[in-house]
C-alpha cells in the first residue's frame, strides 16, 4: 500500500490536543498514519500515512475535518545508504 507524507498547521493546539489528533490519525480507516511528528513551537504536524491512493487519503482527511497544507506520495527512500523504491 502506498505511503504519503502530509503537513498540517496546528493553530493554538495543546500537547494533549496534538496527542489526541495523532491518535485519531493512527486509527483511521481508509488512511492510517504510521508515524506522526510534531513541532509545537512552529505549530506543524507531519504524518506518514498508508492509503490506497492520494484520493482516498484526501477524502479521509476531509471526512475527519483535518486540514492539511500538502500531501505527497513517498516514491523513494534510503535503505542501507542507497536510494530504493519505497515499500
Language model region names:
Residues 7, 48-50:
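Short hydrophobic/aromatic beta-strand micro-patches
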Residues 25-46:
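Short, glycine- and small/hydrophobic-rich beta-strand elements in well-ordered beta-sheets
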Residues 28-31, 52-78:
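An amphipathic, aromatic/His-enriched active-site/gating alpha helix that lines ligand/cofactor pockets
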Residues 1, 39-42, 53, 61:
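Short linear sequence motifs
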Residues 44, 62-63, 82:
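Context-gated lysine
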Amino acid at each position: 500500500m502506498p505511503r504519503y507524507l502530509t503537513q498540517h498547521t496546528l493553530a493554538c493546539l495543546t500537547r494533549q490536543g496534538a496527542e489526541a489528533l495523532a491518535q485519531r490519525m493512527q486509527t483511521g480507516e481508509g488512511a492510517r498514519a504510521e508515524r506522526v511528528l510534531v513541532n509545537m513551537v512552529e505549530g506543524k504536524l507531519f504524518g506518514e500515512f498508508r492509503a490506497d491512493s492520494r484520493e482516498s487519503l484526501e477524502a479521509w482527511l476531509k471526512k475527519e475535518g483535518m486540514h492539511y497544507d500538502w500531501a505527497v506520495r513517498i516514491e523513494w527512500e534510503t535503505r542501507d545508504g542507497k536510494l530504493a523504491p519505497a515499500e
